[in-house]
């Protein structure tokens, strides 16, 4: 990472490097480790022995390409072959064969996997590292209780605690605890060995009474006592081999296997020298832990911070895949054992080929990628989303936390996160703080710990330090880029030391950071002037950049941070030259390259759909006849320009109120953004249908569909599938399909049968089950795929997929956002002549609410806005590093004002920079031509169009389904649901006195079954709709629920006459 010639200079690592390193570690080490664990398998008579020869395993290159795997819904994987031998002990013969044991999914160049045609990615998980941790809690009397928690490699926990009388207990369950002497004796130590291996033997002897001596008199007695407490069994259990096996399986295996990481942590914490190859908890560990617990009781030793990253480990791609491979080998072992016994029973001669099946490995990985919480579908909204998804860190998942149980302390930022986990980038909502993102330079070490690089000043080299190690050094904060080394060495600088901030002389500094963005994730590093923003708004910006839609014509940002090119390059979306050569031919779908005596055809991505329905497309940026070098960019992708990430557009913005249309973060825009396709994007929707073989026969795809109007079938070809290039509207048939059915003549009404007999209509033997275009799906058909699988059975159906492209201009209801957490909904589209205009006559494109800045404390947008205006006038682009105040005070403001002043001079426009109100200008009302009373901030920020679009959200219900229990309309757009009129909505309607509307909402349009039917009848016949007289279904449901609680509701009328009668009787 550090070159010899330029000391102190560091390069940014590949953003997908963590995924690649994890998968390579699994292939190089993890496979062999698990294969070596595979045992020798013998039959019951011990005549035949089966074993694997691990030294000769091999992975075969995949037979299909990545694109073909996606197209044909297959898994991009490699076949694993291992040599296996079958030994007959009687004749000492051995048969050896190379066997196929299954497919292992391969990682592609994007750091993702292709499983059943879907791009999936594995998320890194943060777990508590195995080892021992000491903490202190106050009991109900306010006295400190010290406990030591031993965490195993499996995630099981055992606790040691010391009471007021300095007695040490091992807690085996929430309610049961036993003496540590019993636990040590059950693990194989006698009293003499215990007293010899502890530092405080007199304390152990102090609570040793006769009853305790009897319990630890022998190992068998200790095991019986331990089993009685652990299993909570009464009576007197008898010592047996099965009892020991049960204890071994349920307790020792789950709670006492530390693993190599746990053994390392235990040795370090307790100053032990137990060999690393001994992964199990030993009596010596228990006694050393008890000694440390006694020391804490008497004020010696330190407690552990459970949230420190030195006490966490990363479960990476390698660990997840290795665990699943081990699980598959266990299943394979059971299958081989059963097959051998079956072959011997039926007197067959087995071979290694016959004994091994590929099903366990293949099905294990398929279920893992399909069901595991840490295996997620790749989010492909834009190139930034793809690269950020693989760098996520999650506390959730198997063995981790849940959103309900995680407390605030776990979610909070910790000093050890510095340079390892981004303090900004996390999810919003219930998982805040539980899903984080890796810092740019962080890497996962060999032991699963997060490491961060620092520059060692004395040795002039870059060090990668583990969590906790940097606390022993004085680390200068933010001194990576110095304008003048001599000036820097004389100054007093802020530094970190033992999780505290100090101000020390430069000579006392040991380490310094190597990069200004070292502490942030990729998303946060793309925010210019981030130091001027509130952290909550920066968090929103990091998330919203991942929701930006690729536009039809992308544009570079005028004000950036310098990481845009690296982010685009590592996303894998660009087409990169793999060798030198000359461009022979360029087209929209390929580039021909000559070099090294051959011609290379490089295919380009054309109108490919992402899983968020955005359009992924590559555009050539090299010309015919040009010579290119290896690593040069051949084609731009969606949302990139010139190899730089380009998610939005630089538009002219004014911060001012306008007739209330930008109230509460609403945004007013010009019609220019619509007519000139500034924010136009393409979206590709996928519609699919399957053809099955039913009990009545196979389903047919045809264009001859009875009882359907001809114009609905106008786009179908001879085979019944929509033609490429067709324009389709809502309700059109995309795929014509008929499903066979058996209909008896007796099932029809008599008048139907009479009409059929008179008109000669035959009984239909099939029903129409066509694929129809749903509401909001209008567009152009760009691709049709008929995936025909072998067999064609009902379990292996054929599938037809139709891809339709939509062109969406920006409209009222769409969501736009800047890069500083400033988001809003389009409220009105004004004509150009009505928009406020500048002193040079240019109308602004957007009007933002100025009240959205001071309360949100995201002042960075003001700097970006003004600097963007100066850059557009000077035709310059700026790349701003964060925390530029380390050079001088008010550096950001000085830069912006100097560029505005220069733009004002060069363009001869004095309104660009006015000394009375720098950054602001007087603008005019487009409707009247009069200037506004106050000067207004104008500029050119970078504004994104987000995936939250009104076309995907707007919905109306005319008819639809009702819930079975409440008989009220379903909820949700996908179910054609209705809009709920709740309690507060009813109050609002009551306030306006709209009795009839209120009655309709609560009866006819909701859950009054009889009233609904009467409305339908009277609408068809014509007449007055009767008022409902009985109770709606929801009230009936309430009555039934009360009855289930043994409460009966009755009603009766009380008149004055009845009241007097009841009063006399009383």
UniProtKB/Swiss-Prot annotation:
Function description: DNA-dependent RNA polymerase catalyzes the transcription of DNA into RNA using the four ribonucleoside triphosphates as substrates.
Keyword Transferase appears in the UniProt entry: yes
Catalytic reaction list: RNA(n) + a ribonucleoside 5'-triphosphate = RNA(n+1) + diphosphate
Primary enzyme class: transferase
InterPro entries to which the protein is assigned, alphabetical: DNA-dir_RNA_pol_bsu_ext_1_sf (IPR042107), DNA-dir_RNA_pol_su2 (IPR015712), DNA-dir_RNAP_su2_dom (IPR007120), DNA-dir_RNAP_su2_hyb_sf (IPR037033), RNA_pol_bsu_bac (IPR010243), RNA_pol_bsu_CS (IPR007121), RNA_pol_bsu_protrusion (IPR007644), RNA_pol_Rpb2_2 (IPR007642)
Subunit structure: In plastids the minimal PEP RNA polymerase catalytic core is composed of four subunits: alpha, beta, beta', and beta''. When a (nuclear-encoded) sigma factor is associated with the core the holoenzyme is formed, which can initiate transcription.
GO biological process: DNA-templated transcription
Superkingdom: Eukaryota
HAMAP family: RNApol_bact_RpoB
Keywords carried by this UniProt record: Chloroplast, DNA-directed RNA polymerase, Nucleotidyltransferase, Plastid, Transcription, Transferase
GO terms under cellular component: chloroplast; DNA-directed RNA polymerase complex; mitochondrion
Chief place where the protein resides: plastid
UniProt-listed SUPFAM superfamilies: beta and beta-prime subunits of DNA dependent RNA-polymerase
The keyword Nucleotidyltransferase belongs to this UniProt entry's keyword annotation: yes
Gene: rpoB
EC number in record: 2.7.7.6
Gene Ontology MF term list: DNA binding; DNA-directed RNA polymerase activity; ribonucleoside binding
Lineage of source species: Eukaryota, Viridiplantae, Streptophyta, Embryophyta, Tracheophyta
UniProt family annotation: Belongs to the RNA polymerase beta chain family.
Localization terms from the record: Plastid, Chloroplast
Name this polypeptide is given: DNA-directed RNA polymerase subunit beta
């Amino acid at each position: 990472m550090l070159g010899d010639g330029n000391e102190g200079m560091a390069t940014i690592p590949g953003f997908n490097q963590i995924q690649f390193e994890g998968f390579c570690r699994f292939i190089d080490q993890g496979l062999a480790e698990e294969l070596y664990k595979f045992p020798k398998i013998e039959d019951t008579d011990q005549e035949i022995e089966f074993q694997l020869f691990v030294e000769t395993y091999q992975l075969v290159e995949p037979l299909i390409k990545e694109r073909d795997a996606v197209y044909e819904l297959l898994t991009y994987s490699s076949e694993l072959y291992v040599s296996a031998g079958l030994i007959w002990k009687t004749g000492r013969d051995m048969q050896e064969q190379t066997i196929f044991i299954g497919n292992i999914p391969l990682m592609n160049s994007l750091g993702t996997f292709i499983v059943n045609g879907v791009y999936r990615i594995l998320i890194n998980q943060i777990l508590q590292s195995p080892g021992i941790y000491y903490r202190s809690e106050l009991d109900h009397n306010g006295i400190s209780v010290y406990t030591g928690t031993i965490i195993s490699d499996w995630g099981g926990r055992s606790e040691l605690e010391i009471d007021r009388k300095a007695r040490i207990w091992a807690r085996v369950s929430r309610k049961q605890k036993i003496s540590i002497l019993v636990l040590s004796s059950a693990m194989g130590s006698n009293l003499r060995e215990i007293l010899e291996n502890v530092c405080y033997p007199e304390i152990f002897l102090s609570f040793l009474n006769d009853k305790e001596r009897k319990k630890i008199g022998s190992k068998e007695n200790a095991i019986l006592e331990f089993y009685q407490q652990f299993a909570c069994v009464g009576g007197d259990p008898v010592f047996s081999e099965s009892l020991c096996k049960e204890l071994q399986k349920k307790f020792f295996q789950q709670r006492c296997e530390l693993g190599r990481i746990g053994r390392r942590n235990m040795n370090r914490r307790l100053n032990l020298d137990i060999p690393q190859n001994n992964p199990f908890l030993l009596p010596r560990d228990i006694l050393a832990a008890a000694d440390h617990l006694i020391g804490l009781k008497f004020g010696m030793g330190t407690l552990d911070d459970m949230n420190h990253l030195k006490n966490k480990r990363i479960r990476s791609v390698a660990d997840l895949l290795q665990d699943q491979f081990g699980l598959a080998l266990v299943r394979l072992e059971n299958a081989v054992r059963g097959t051998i016994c079956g072959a011997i029973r039926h007197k067959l001669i087995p071979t290694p080929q016959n004994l091994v099946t590929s099903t366990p490995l293949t099905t294990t990985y398929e279920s893992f990628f399909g069901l595991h919480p840490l295996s997620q579908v790749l989010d492909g909204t834009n190139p930034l989303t793809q690269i950020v998804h693989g760098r996520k860190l999650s506390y959730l998942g198997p063995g981790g936390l849940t959103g309900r149980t995680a407390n605030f302390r776990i979610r909070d930022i910790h000093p050890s996160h510095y340079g390892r986990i981004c303090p900004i980038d996390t999810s919003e909502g219930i998982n805040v703080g539980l899903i984080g993102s890796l810092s740019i330079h962080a890497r996962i070490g060999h032991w699963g710990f997060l490491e961060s690089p620092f520059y060692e000043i004395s040795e002039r080299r870059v060090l990668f330090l583990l969590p906790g190690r940097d606390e022993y050094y004085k680390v200068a904060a933010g001194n990576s880029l110095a304008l003048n080394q001599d000036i820097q060495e004389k100054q007093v600088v802020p530094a970190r030391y033992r999780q505290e901030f100090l101000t020390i002389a430069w000579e006392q500094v040991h380490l310094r950071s190597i990069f200004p963005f070292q502490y942030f994730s990729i998303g946060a590093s793309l925010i210019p002037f981030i130091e001027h923003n509130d952290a909550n708004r920066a968090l929103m910006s990091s998330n919203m950049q991942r929701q930006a839609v690729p536009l039809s014509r992308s544009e570079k940002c005028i004000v950036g941070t310098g990481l845009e090119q690296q982010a685009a390059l590592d996303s894998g979306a660009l087409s990169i030259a793999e060798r030198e050569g000359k461009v022979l031919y360029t087209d929209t779908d390929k580039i021909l390259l000559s070099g090294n005596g051959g011609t290379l055809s490089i295919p380009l991505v054309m109108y490919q759909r992402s899983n968020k329905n955005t359009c992924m497309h590559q555009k050539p940026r090299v010309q015919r006849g040009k010579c290119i070098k290896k690593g040069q960019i051949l084609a731009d992708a969606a949302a990139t320009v010139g190899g730089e990430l380009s998610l939005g557009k630089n538009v002219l913005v004014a911060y001012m109120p306008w007739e209330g249309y930008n109230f509460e973060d609403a945004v007013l825009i010009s019609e220019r953004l619509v007519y000139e396709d500034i924010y136009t994007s393409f979206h590709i929707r996928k519609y699919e249908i399957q053809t099955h073989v039913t009990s009545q026969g196979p389903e047919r795809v045809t264009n001859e569909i009875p009882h359907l109007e001809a114009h609905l079938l106008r786009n179908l070809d001879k085979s019944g599938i929509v033609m490429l290039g067709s324009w389709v509207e809502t309700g059109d048939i995309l795929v014509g399909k008929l499903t066979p059915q058996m209909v008896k003549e007796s099932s029809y009404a008599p008048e139907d049968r009479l009409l059929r007999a008179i008109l000669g209509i035959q009984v239909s033997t099939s029903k129409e089950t066509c694929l129809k275009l749903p509401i909001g799906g209008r567009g152009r058909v760009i691709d049709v795929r008929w995936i025909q699988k072998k067999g064609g059975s009902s379990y292996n159906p054929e599938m037809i997929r139709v891809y339709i492209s939509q062109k969406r201009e920006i409209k009222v209801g769409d969501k736009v956002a800047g890069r500083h957490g400033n988001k809003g909904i389009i409220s009105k589209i004004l004509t150009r002549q009505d928009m406020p205009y500048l002193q040079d006559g240019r109308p602004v494109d957007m009007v933002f609410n100025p009240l959205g800045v001071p309360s949100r404390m995201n002042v960075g947008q003001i700097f970006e806005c003004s600097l963007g205006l100066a850059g557009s006038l000077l035709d310059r682009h700026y790349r701003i590093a964060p925390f530029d105040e380390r050079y001088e005070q008010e550096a950001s403001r000085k830069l912006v004002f100097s560029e505005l002043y220069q733009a004002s001079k060069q363009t001869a426009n004095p309104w660009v920079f006015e000394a009375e109100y720098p950054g602001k200008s007087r603008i005019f009302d487009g409707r009247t031509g009069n200037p506004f009373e106050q000067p207004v901030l104008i500029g050119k920020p970078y504004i994104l169009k987000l995936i939250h679009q009104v076309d995907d959200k707007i919905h109306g219900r005319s008819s639809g389904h009702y819930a079975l229990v409440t008989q009220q309309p379903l909820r949700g757009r996908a179910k054609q649901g209705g809009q709920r009129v709740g309690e507060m909505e009813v109050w609002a309607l009551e306030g306006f006195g709209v009795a009839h509307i209120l009655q309709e909402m609560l009866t006819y349009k909701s859950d009054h079954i009889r009233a609904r039917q009467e409305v339908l009848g009277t609408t068809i016949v014509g007449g007055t709709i009767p008022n409902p007289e009985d109770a709606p279904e929801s009230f009936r449901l309430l009555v039934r629920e009360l009855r289930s609680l043994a409460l009966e509701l009755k009603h009766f009328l009380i008149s004055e006459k009845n009241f007097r009668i009841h009063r006399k009787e009383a």
